[in-house]
C-alpha cells in the first residue's frame, strides 16, 4: 500500500482497485476457513453470538492481510459526539526475549478495546476520572487500511460503550435509531 498514491486511470481501471484496502466480504471469503466465514455471516445477521474461536480466526486472517499490505498497527476506530473520529493505536509487533519481534493479534484484541477510556476524547461530556468504557467491534462494518506519512494502520470500526451505560458516540446512537425504527 503506497501513501498518497496517484492513480493513472488511463492505465488502471477503478474496478481493479476499488476496495483493495478494505477487509471486505470477498477478502474474508478468500482468507477465512469456510466454517468460520459461515459462522461470521450468522453473527453479522444477528442469528448467532460471536465465539472467541471465530474471533481468533478472523483476527489471524485480518492481521495476515493487513501486514501483507504494510500495516504494523491497528486501531479501534469510532466516532464520539464531538463529530470527529477517535482511535487508540496498538501494535501487531511484540518483542521477544531474544531481541526479535513476533506479530500478534488475538480475537480478544479484535472484539474489545481499552477498558480505561481516559485517552479518548469526550467532547466535554464527562470528567476524565469517569472515563471507564471500552470499544466493541462492529462485525457488520469492514475493517480498512489507512496510510499516512507514519505508516499503515488497520482501522477496526467499533462502537464505544461507557461503563455508565451512556453512549458518547454518534455511531451507537444511529444503530439504536435504526433498531427502534423497526419496532414501530
Regions found by a protein language model. Give the residues of each.
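Flexible C-terminal active-site loop/helix
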Residues: 109-173, 177-180, 184
Amino acid at each position: 500500500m503506497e501513501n498518497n498514491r496517484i492513480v493513472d486511470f488511463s492505465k488502471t481501471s477503478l474496478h481493479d482497485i476499488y476496495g483493495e484496502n478494505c477487509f471486505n466480504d470477498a477478502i474474508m471469503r478468500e482468507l477465512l476457513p469456510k466454517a468460520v466465514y459461515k459462522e461470521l455471516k450468522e453473527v453479522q445477521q444477528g442469528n448467532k453470538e460471536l465465539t472467541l474461536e471465530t474471533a481468533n480466526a478472523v483476527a489471524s486472517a485480518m492481521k495476515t492481510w493487513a501486514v501483507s499490505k504494510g500495516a504494523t498497527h491497528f486501531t479501534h476506530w469510532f466516532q464520539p459526539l464531538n463529530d470527529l473520529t477517535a482511535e487508540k493505536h496498538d501494535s501487531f509487533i511484540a518483542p521477544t526475549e531474544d531481541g526479535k519481534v513476533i506479530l500478534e493479534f488475538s480475537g480478544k484484541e479484535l472484539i474489545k478495546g481499552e477498558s480505561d477510556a481516559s485517552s479518548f476524547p469526550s467532547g466535554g461530556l464527562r470528567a476524565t476520572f469517569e472515563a471507564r468504557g471500552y470499544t466493541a467491534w462492529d462485525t457488520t462494518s469492514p475493517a480498512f487500511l489507512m496510510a499516512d506519512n507514519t505508516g499503515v494502520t488497520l482501522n477496526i470500526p467499533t462502537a464505544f460503550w461507557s461503563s455508565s451505560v451512556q453512549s458518547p458516540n454518534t455511531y451507537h446512537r444511529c444503530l439504536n435509531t435504526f433498531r427502534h425504527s423497526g419496532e414501530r
